[in-house]
A protein has these predicted regions:
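Catalytic glycan-binding domains that act on GlcNAc-containing polysaccharides
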Residues: 1-142
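Long, low-complexity, intrinsically disordered segments
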Residues: 146-160
C-alpha cells in the first residue's frame, strides 16, 4: 500500500461506498448491511455477482464463488492496492489506473471518475496535487463530492 499516493485508497473507498465495510450493489440496488454475516448472505443470494465491500470490488469477476473477502476491509484494501499498483505499472499514470479500477469505458466517463476521486482525495490527503490538473475544483459537483467525502470520513472516524 505504501507505493500508492497518500490518501488514494481512502479516497476510492469514500467514493465507492462512503467507507461502509459491508456495502453491496446487487443488480443496481445499494444495500448497507449492519454486519459481515448479513452482507455475505445477501451476496450469496445474488449468486456472488455484484459489487462488494468498502471498495465495491466486482465479486463476479475477482472473487471465487462463495468467498466474501471483499467484506473484510483489510483484505480488500490489500487487494485494491495491488490492483491499482498493477495498473499504474501498466499505464504509468494514476488517473488511468483509477479509470481501470472503475471500468470507465470512455475518456469522459474516466475524467468523471477521476474528478470524483479527486474531490474525496482533498478530504483524505488535503493539498494533494494528484489529479489536480484534470479537475476543476470550483465546479459544483466537485464541491458537493468533497462535502460528501468529508461527512463520510467524519462518521467513519467517530465510529473507530
Amino acid at each position: 500500500k505504501s507505493s500508492l499516493p497518500e490518501g488514494l485508497l481512502t479516497a476510492i473507498a469514500l467514493n465507492e461506498s462512503g467507507l461502509h465495510a459491508y456495502a453491496l450493489n446487487l443488480r443496481g440496488r445499494a444495500y448497507f448491511p449492519d454486519n459481515r454475516a448479513e452482507a455475505a448472505r445477501l451476496l450469496r443470494a445474488a449468486g456472488g455477482r455484484g459489487m462488494a465491500g468498502c471498495f465495491q470490488i466486482n465479486a463476479g469477476v475477482h472473487v471465487a464463488r462463495g468467498d466474501d473477502w471483499p467484506l473484510d476491509p483489510e483484505k480488500a484494501a490489500d487487494w485494491a492496492a495491488s490492483y491499482l499498483a498493477q495498473h499504474y505499472e501498466t499505464y504509468g499514470d494514476w488517473g488511468r489506473a483509477v479509470m481501470r479500477w472503475h471500468g470507465a469505458s470512455s475518456q469522459r466517463a474516466g475524467t468523471q471518475i477521476i474528478c470524483r476521486v479527486h474531490s474525496k482525495l482533498e478530504v483524505a490527503a488535503p493539498g494533494s496535487k494528484l489529479f489536480a490538473d484534470r479537475c476543476r475544483p470550483g465546479a459544483p459537483q466537485w464541491a458537493r463530492g468533497r462535502r460528501n467525502g468529508a461527512a463520510h470520513l467524519e462518521v467513519a472516524e467517530a465510529e473507530d
